[in-house]
Amino acid sequence: TSETCSLDIIGAKFIREIENGEIVVITNKGIKSIKPFPVVNCRPDIFEYIYFSRPDSELGGKSIYDCRKNFGIELAKESKTQADIVTAVPDSGMPAAIGFAAQSKIPFELGLIRNHYVGRTFIEPVQKIRSLGVKLKLNANKSSIKDKKIILIDDSLVRGTTCHKIVKM
């Protein structure tokens, strides 16, 4: 699993990651590892580090939170942009924004508030539904952003729907 946090929640001990092409069978008789496929040169899916995995998980022996925070630190080192605040597209953009703010010495503020009862919008099949989903999912925290020059950190750009709606807020 790429979600080691699920093991934490149930009190299970993380032993190791399942290898590429491996099948692990768990029965009453024990655990058996099968590798029926030829070994290939696999590469990690970067979206696991920047978007899909929860920040309280580990992947490849690395903390997802620390990876995302370090992405923000590196981005701040490259950026010469000045602003009043740093904010993030919640939730997965938060660690990178925190890292960016720490490195740049620009204060972090919650500029967008997320409705946690709306799911991922980029997977919706129709643009109109995706746009409505973004509108329901995010709202500007006006007291934090009004009349401010903002650095907005997002973790990924899949379709651009979220970006366009946020700018209009």
Named regions from a protein language model:
Residues 1-169:
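PRPP-associated nucleotide enzymes
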